[in-house]
């Protein structure tokens, strides 16, 4: 919501929200709708419209569905040349790096890939939450983010705190990696 608030002061901004169909996804959708109505921001909403295939990671399925919707929006004439700004932050970078490292890759989230821009990658989630509180910008945390049966959530709640005990400067190190990483252009 912080990124939307920053951008909502500009003209010609539209918000794209994707409802993953989780228990509290409707609550998030309502919050985004209200915010966009209050700030006169155009809103496009996508929703999961099929069941995930068996033997497929639910997280991967949700991500694929979300980006498929983004691409559908991006292919409409009105939005064809418009960049998409996602709200990934530094905590996501650390989690993704650990996640991909466990799978033998160790990749960072790129700050730019094709039409997708991620300007908040060097900013901690707590800083964004604090900013939202101070500026009375509403946001909602999806309760499914606490479910450690999902690998990324396990990393977030179990591995990252342990890594911080060993190296309290991990976010500083990762911020430097983000700031020095090359931009990926598709």
Question: At which residue positions do the language-model features occur?
Answer:
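Core alpha/beta nucleotide-donor-binding catalytic domains of modification enzymes
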Residues: 1-157
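ATP/NTP-dependent adenylation/nucleotidyl-transfer catalytic domains that generate, transfer
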Residues: 149-186
């Amino acid at each position: 919501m912080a990124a939307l608030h920053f951008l909502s002061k500009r003209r010609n901004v539209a918000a794209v929200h994707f409802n993953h169909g989780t228990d509290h996804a409707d609550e998030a959708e309502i919050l985004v709708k209200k915010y966009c109505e209050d700030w006169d921001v155009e809103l496009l909403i996508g929703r999961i419209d099929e069941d995930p295939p068996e033997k497929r990671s639910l997280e991967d399925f949700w991500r694929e569905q979300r980006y498929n919707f983004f691409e559908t929006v991006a292919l409409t004439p009105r939005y064809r040349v418009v960049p998409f700004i996602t709200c990934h932050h530094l905590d996501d970078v650390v989690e993704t790096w650990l996640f991909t490292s466990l799978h033998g890759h160790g990749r960072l989230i790129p700050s730019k890939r094709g039409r997708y821009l991620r300007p908040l990658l060097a900013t901690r989630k707590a800083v964004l939450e604090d900013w939202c509180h101070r500026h009375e910008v509403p946001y909602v945390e999806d309760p499914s983010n606490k479910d450690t049966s999902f690998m990324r959530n396990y990393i977030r709640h179990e591995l990252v705190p342990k890594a911080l005990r060993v190296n309290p400067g991990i976010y500083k190190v990762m911020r430097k990696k983000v700031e020095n990483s090359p931009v990926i252009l598709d």
